[in-house]
Curated annotation (Swiss-Prot):
Source organism phylogeny: Bacteria, Pseudomonadati, Pseudomonadota, Gammaproteobacteria, Pseudomonadales
An annotated Gene Ontology molecular function: metal ion binding
Cofactor note: Binds 1 [4Fe-4S] cluster per subunit.
Protein name in the entry: Quinolinate synthase
Organism name: Marinobacter nauticus (strain ATCC 700491 / DSM 11845 / VT8) (Marinobacter aquaeolei)
GO CC terms: cytosol
Family that this chain belongs to: Belongs to the quinolinate synthase family. Type 1 subfamily.
Record localization: Cytoplasm
């Protein structure tokens, strides 16, 4: 798939999706109260990504769920005793929850919430790409379909990608990476590994621009620049901190700067402001009206998660995630490798603390 074809496919997909309608304060309060009751009645737990609407994030926290990056979401859903997991995020997150928890019911506010990285990496084309390079270890980003994961040797998230590729490189393995070329390029540069890249990108992060960021830094010279590695290399080069969502949140909490220019989805501002209320957060500039995204610096698919469709799925159960048993087994292996590796990595870090 060419870059132009990829972008057209994403635009066509977005044209058929709808964001939740704006709600009044009283409507929100009523929906939230009903959702809390429904979660208890259904023995369900709400797991939300940092990029979802602040109302969804707050509700997850208030009801004993979690707000996290994709790795922690996977862990939490796997370990929580609830019989139903409601995933507020995008489709690959729901699929991952089902792969790790086949005995649980996994629901999403909408199954139409996908990801440009997922859309831009069709399983059949990716499998052909892998077949052309049988000597390479296949490493795929979590932002992929279950079918793509099933073709992989390893699954990674942005928080563990560098460590896993370093581990593989130390063993002399050459890497085939998909789908995000910017994250893959960053990992390639920081590890020195031999990495062959699939040509995919995130429609939100790709819109951050070096020139605009340079101008903004001139206006806020004391601000630290925080960048997600799905951003273009020129933007990454300007960063004071490059990291996953959880790593960027930690930076806001721990760095002495009072101001931060943040180059990732602005849904993260809710958690950043919650944990560091005295810090000033500034959105990094994007391509403006020429951007693919409906609302620059915010994923249009994450925005599809709303209170109304959350209540609907709890009451009706019609947005359930299903993964074929054979496909699930194949996708589980690389996911388990990631979870086991990161668990061991955390144990070693604790031992050295």
């Amino acid at each position: 798939m060419t870059k132009a074809q990829d972008r057209i496919l994403v635009q066509e997909h977005l044209a058929h999706q709808a964001e939740p309608k704006p709600l009044s304060a009283s409507e929100k309060a009523d929906l939230e109260a009903r959702i809390k009751v429904a979660l208890k009645e259904k023995d369900a737990v709400l797991v939300a990504h940092y990029y979802t609407d602040p109302d969804i994030q707050r509700l997850a926290e208030e009801t004993g769920g979690c707000v996290a990056d994709s790795l922690e979401m996977a862990r939490f859903g796997n370990q929580h005793p609830a019989s139903t997991v409601v995933v507020a995020g995008v489709r690959f997150m729901g699929e991952t929850a089902k792969i790790l928890n086949p005995e649980k019911k996994v629901l999403m506010p909408t199954l139409e919430a996908t990801c440009s990285l997922d859309v831009g990496c069709p399983a059949d084309e990716f499998s052909e790409f892998c077949d052309q390079h049988p000597d390479r270890t296949v490493v795929v980003y979590a932002n992929t379909s279950a079918a793509v994961k099933a073709r992989a040797d390893w699954v990674v998230t942005s928080s563990c990608a560098q460590a896993i590729v370093e581990h593989l490189d130390a063993k002399g393995e050459k890497i085939l990476w998909a789908p995000d070329k910017h994250l893959g390029g960053y990992v390639q540069k920081t590890t020195g590994a031999d990495v062959l890249l699939w040509d995919g990108s995130c429609i939100v992060h790709e819109e951050f621009k070096y020139r605009g960021l340079e101008d903004l830094k001139a206006l806020y010279p004391d601000a630290a620049i925080l960048v997600h590695p799905e951003s273009p290399d020129a933007v990454v080069q300007m960063a004071d901190v490059v990291g996953s969502t959880s790593q960027l949140i930690h930076a806001v909490q721990t760095l002495p700067n009072e101001e931060f220019i943040v180059a990732t989805d602005n849904g993260i501002f809710y958690k950043m402001q919650q944990l560091a209320p005295n810090k000033t957060l500034i959105e990094a500039p994007t391509a403006g009206n020429g951007a693919t995204c409906r609302s620059c610096a915010h994923c249009p698919w994450m925005a599809m998660n709303g209170l109304e469709n959350l209540l609907h799925v709890l009451e009706h159960g019609d947005q359930e995630v299903h993964v074929d048993d054979e496909l699930r087994e194949d996708a589980l292996r690389p996911l388990r490798r990631m979870l086991d590796f990161t668990a061991n990595m955390n144990l070693k870090a604790a031992g050295n603390a």
